[in-house]
């Protein structure tokens, strides 16, 4: 149906295009831009060479010479230069250039370029000559709005010139204007270039930076002078954290939750923080499930077809957060090994039938996984344990580790402790093992895994240091990254720690004295830190904000967090991802001119994106759910880098791109340092935190679209009515914050310290209430649509209802197809997919993991609002029916009815959420 519709639409478009009048497209063919950088230089006593910068869409150029009355065309050329010969000696000639392109067989010309005037080479020193060089006494000006400055020009040679007249121009008159004498007037914040042009097009330029007059402008300007040295420091620190094997647990570079390497690195970072000059440096202990990988290998002993004894040694092996053979004990020295394909229940059953056995006791299973496109590691791992395998050895078949077939990969396991080893090898090593299995005889495998894991038995350290505030506000701003890693982890996240320390260094070196505390945190246990949950990452940060420093809740103005900040994936735009309510702060900073003297790393600058998709996959989630708004740079279109390098040994300090996926960029690190140092200083310098709750209202409004299909019209109308009133309150709240900040700036400009202090006090009071409201939004409205996407509670259910409804419709239209059968896979945040692949035991465990039924406290607790826990049973039975070859629609009615029952349950829950959210809007309105 959709393909047919697409074809019809495409045909209609093609037909409409072919029937358009001939001139239709010509209307869009506007004239090319006029040539720029036109110059006229004497070549001989009778010739002058003209040159110019071309226009991007021009086909050619026309040269015009002044004949005493008008400009006459003397040459048409495709080149960007022309030499006019046979000229009279010592006579001055004037020229202009036009660009042209051809549209519908006709030439369309640009406007004239500016005029250039020159003489051929002088026949004697007494004759006039051309300017050869223009020199300005200043090549850069830094000004404030309203200020003026003089640019003085000198011309070379010093003798008689055709004319000494100079034409002055500004690249942006809205930033700075220049008069005919070279007097520059700063108009508005920004950057522009002033050009002095001589008669023949020879120029000199001066860059103008008009600074904002905001109170934090001077501090930020000073800071930017120190980013170069701080970047060198950040690069060295990032490299040390990645490649110093004394700070790793094994030869591949692992540094995981509560491990010896984490502890050593915490000591190292605490020392670095002190050397930078941070105050109150501490190592804050947090409880995690310990994981320390030390070593793993496997040896296959077998006989080849000639009966010769052979050995295959697999040394390139790492372990997931699962038990090691050393820790479990027992004999792993002579095990069978079986190729189990993708490790599904059906493949095990087929193996049992073929080999006349009932389980995998005494066997290692070899399983291929694609954790990008297919299924996470928890499914194959749990299924292997259910089938009583001695161990599972996995390898990538797609998605991650795509760099090459000799690349290892590692991810968080998102599973219970199944008391069974689970390791990862390369695809090429898997091919070697398969070859032995297929062609060898008497194959026996010895597996050795030294991997220490345990539940609530580990201690990780978050390393903290601060630049103390001077205003005794009781508030703070956090700047953070994590230092645990897989393999080298150069980008993820060693360079991020380097950047955090670099920001601290550049602030301290520049003499910055914040009003609020600026707290720098190196988190441990971000990659993994908890068994028995699908939300097993960001545990170090969760423990920090909930157990170690719960007092940070309500006093932390923002978290600025970093993940892989130095990867250049060739984007024209950088992205500042933010919690919805603080996106406006990022936009205001970028528009403020505070970074006018910092060249953007990105061609089209940085865009701000309200984000509930990427932030939850980082430490930001722990803080956001506890009332702290978050910022984080994150490039778009980085998927190929992630597929090739993320969580592999290829996450390294590569600066030469051989895969088209991206490189490490020191220049990007320096830009991030300037931008996000400025962000922290900007937030610090504005007494009132300008939270825009109307941005979150946009989220609420989008969430209610389509809800009337499942909730009463009255309840939806009440929701929308309350939302309209909430918008009014949100607008007033933001205006109040802006007024406080405007009062502060006015007092600053007036030099009124008393009024500045009063505005600061008003800001503290405002922030206390605004952060309470922000936390209330997180508590009352926001849930998880799956294990990593934040969504409004009722919308989580609505997403699931839409899927159930789609399944019911497909099963009820009288024509059952395989596509119909697979629609249900997306239910419950894609966890329903397990019903097609795995045993009842695994499906039960996966739903427990999704719903966090066995973990009392982590950021996913009580947040997963979408699931009907047992719908997988219906899906599994439906799929079994299909696999029996049944296509009779009547046979699927029972499943459609069961799905309708789940929908009824979800509708009741959704209705309750719509009601509770409507009530919460009333409360939130009063809080604002």
Predicted regions and their residues:
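Noncatalytic luminal/extracellular "stalk/propeptide" segments of secretory-pathway proteins
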Residues: 228, 243-359
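Beta-strand-rich modules
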Residues: 84-105
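Soluble metallo-hydrolase cores and metallopeptidase-like ectodomains found primarily
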Residues: 319-351, 411-490, 502-512
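His/Asp/Glu-rich mid-to-C-terminal helical/loop segments that flank catalytic regions of hydrolases
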Residues: 639-698, 823, 827, 835, ...
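Extracellular/luminal Protease-associated
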Residues: 256-258, 315-421, 606-609
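Metal-dependent peptidase/peptidase-like ectodomains
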Residues: 523-643, 724-792
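Pro/Thr/Ser/Gly-rich low-complexity, intrinsically disordered linker/stalk tracts
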Residues: 27-57, 89, 106-123
